[in-house]
Design a protein with these regions (language model features):
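Conserved class I S-adenosyl-L-methionine
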Residues: 2-54
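Class I SAM-dependent methyltransferase SAM/SAH-binding core
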Residues: 61, 67-114
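A short acidic, Gly/Pro-enriched loop at the edge of an enzyme's catalytic core
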Residues: 113-125
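A short SAM/SAH-binding and catalytic strip from SAM-dependent methyltransferases
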Residues: 124-138
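A short glycine-rich, Lys/Arg-flanked "PGG" loop and its adjoining helix->strand segment in the class I
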Residues: 141-153
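Conserved beta-strand signature within the Rossmann-like core of class I S-adenosyl-L-methionine
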Residues: 154-161
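Short alpha-helix
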Residues: 171-187, 191-192
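A C-terminal cap/extension of S-adenosyl-L-methionine-dependent methyltransferases
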Residues: 178, 192-236
């Protein structure tokens, strides 16, 4: 119990140190909106590939929903507000999400590993750049197990995170594909590498926005993985 709270407290401190750099993630920056649009296209491609066509009928929980930006995207894509939910550790981000999202969207505060959510109640559990902020392996595993428990058979975990360490930021660490598979050993993984390395993206987009697309054609320069981790359906 103490270890769980220690890591949750550490995450809070890491995000507080990161707040000063938030301007780098403004959608007014060309590399940022291109990163977001690329991820959206890849996500929609995964939905189509895996038969998730009726978005309005799907129940989705985002772990680490922040200020609600991803949930707003999902609403625009066709998810219904009453079928969306978010969990957020940081009170100020949770308050911002509550002020932004429809009242029908349920939001949970606090440590997600302690969330009292019904097993197999979600079609999708979405997690975006969360595990890279968790530096305790045991805490990572507990969260992954909770997420897997919430997903119904035939559903899955939608995962987006970076895979390599950032030497300039010791508050995060990359989550390689092998580690992701280790966290969800029963999952069937469909992964694709996306997102031009942010330091490169910032430099080239400053010269011209179109250079993001050009440099992103080189797979070795992509630092993130978007994956659908399918939970096997029950035999019929």
């Amino acid at each position: 119990m103490t270890q769980r709270h220690d890591e949750a407290d550490a995450v809070t401190q890491r995000y507080a140190r990161r707040a000063a750099a938030d301007g780098r993630y403004s959608l007014l920056r060309p590399e940022v909106w291109q990163t977001v649009q690329e991820r959206q296209r890849a996500m929609l491609g995964l939905f189509v590939k895996h038969g998730l066509a009726d978005l309005a009928s799907l129940r989705l929980l985002e772990v680490g929903c922040g200020s609600g930006g991803n949930l707003l995207e999902l609403l625009r894509l066709g998810f219904r507000p009453e079928h969306l939910a978010g969990a957020e550790l940081l009170p100020e981000r949770l308050a911002a999400a509550r002020a932004t999202l429809p009242a029908a969207t349920v939001l949970h505060g606090g440590d997600a590993t302690a969330l009292a959510l019904e097993a197999q109640s979600q079609d999708i559990v979405f997690v975006s750049t969360v595990f890279s902020s968790l530096l305790d392996d045991a805490f990572q595993q507990r969260l992954a197990e909770a997420m897997w428990r919430w997903v119904r058979p035939g559903g899955g975990v939608l995962w987006y995170d970076f895979t390599i360490d950032n030497p300039a930021n010791r508050d995060v660490r990359g989550v390689p594909l092998a580690r992701m598979r280790q966290l969800f050993p029963q999952g069937h993984v469909d992964a694709r590498r996306i997102t031009l390395a942010p330091p490169i993206a910032r430099r080239v987009a400053r010269l011209h926005p179109s250079l993001y697309t050009l440099f992103n054609t080189v797979p070795a320069l992509r630092t993130h993985v978007l994956a659908w981790i399918a939970k096997p359906d029950l035999p019929r």
